[in-house]
C-alpha cells in the first residue's frame, strides 16, 4: 500500500482533523504491485473525520500499478465523514474512492468561490475556537484564533 497526501499519507484513529490545509503539490510515485491512495490533503482517510479543511496543491502520479489506484484532489480513499471541506487543483474529482456519502467541494471560482467556502467552513467551526478569513481576493483563506 502506498498512501500519499499533503498533510498525511494515512489516518487511522477516531480523531478529527479540524481547520487544516495543504498547499503543496503531491507527487505519487507508483509501485508496480501496490495499491495506491493519493490526495491533496490525505491519501487514505480510514479513521479521522475531516472538518473545515482545504487543499490546493496539484496531485500527479508517475509510473503505473496493477493494484487499485485511487487519486483525488482532496482525498485518495475515504471511509469517514467529510464536512465543509474544499479543494482547488488539477483534479475534477475530490475523492478518488468514497465509502461515505459525504463529499468535498471544488472551488471553481464561479459557482463556488473562496468566500462561499470560508462561510461554509466557519459555519461548521462555530464551536471550535477558530475561524477562516478570506481578506484578499485572489489569495487563500487564512486561519485565525477567535
What is the meaning of each model-derived region?
Residues 1-146:
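Predominantly extracellular beta-rich ligand-binding scaffolds that present long acidic/polar faces
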Amino acid at each position: 500500500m502506498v498512501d500519499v497526501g499533503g498533510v498525511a499519507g494515512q489516518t487511522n484513529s477516531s480523531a478529527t482533523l479540524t481547520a487544516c490545509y495543504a498547499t503543496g503539490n503531491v507527487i505519487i510515485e507508483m509501485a508496480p504491485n501496490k495499491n495506491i491512495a493519493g490526495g491533496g490533503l490525505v491519501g487514505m482517510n480510514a479513521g479521522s473525520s475531516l472538518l473545515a479543511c482545504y487543499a490546493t496543491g496539484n496531485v500527479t502520479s508517475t509510473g503505473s500499478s496493477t493494484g487499485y489506484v485511487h487519486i483525488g484532489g482532496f482525498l485518495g480513499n475515504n471511509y469517514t465523514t467529510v464536512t465543509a471541506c474544499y479543494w482547488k487543483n488539477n483534479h475534477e474529482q475530490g475523492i478518488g474512492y468514497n465509502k461515505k456519502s459525504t463529499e468535498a467541494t471544488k472551488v471553481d471560482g464561479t459557482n463556488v468561490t473562496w468566500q462561499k467556502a470560508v462561510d461554509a467552513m466557519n459555519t461548521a467551526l462555530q464551536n471550535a475556537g477558530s475561524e477562516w478569513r478570506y481578506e484578499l481576493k485572489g489569495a487563500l483563506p487564512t486561519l485565525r484564533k477567535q
